[in-house]
Amino acid sequence: MSDSNTGTVKWFNEDKGFGFLTQDNGGADVFVHFRAIASEGFKTLDEGQKVTFEVEQGPKGLQASNVIAL
């Protein structure tokens, strides 16, 4: 289940370091934690930003990994 997906940031709370992504393929929203963002420095995402990511099964449901802002 780790194929590369594209989607949009639904929301991201930079104070708490997490949010959700909407998948372009119509799948369920995916949890994203700041540690999954593949960038240097302060890791955050903006609402509406396009991203690519992989989907993994986490302890509480789907979660994103290797998130790259487009």
Swiss-Prot record:
Keywords: Activator, Cytoplasm, DNA-binding, Stress response, Transcription, Transcription regulation. Induction: By cold shock. Residues 7-67 form the CSD domain. PROSITE patterns: CSD_1, CSD_2. The keyword Transcription applies. Gene3D superfamilies: 6.20.370.130, Nucleic acid-binding proteins. GO terms for molecular function: DNA binding. It is found in: Cytoplasm. InterPro entries: Cold_shock_CspA, Cold_shock_domain, CSD, CSD_CS, CSP_DNA-bd, NA-bd_OB-fold. Pfam families: CSD. The keyword Nucleus does not apply. One of its GO terms (cellular component) is cytosol. PANTHER family: COLD SHOCK DOMAIN CONTAINING PROTEINS. This is Cold shock-like protein CspA. It comes from Shewanella violacea (strain JCM 10179 / CIP 106290 / LMG 19151 / DSS12).
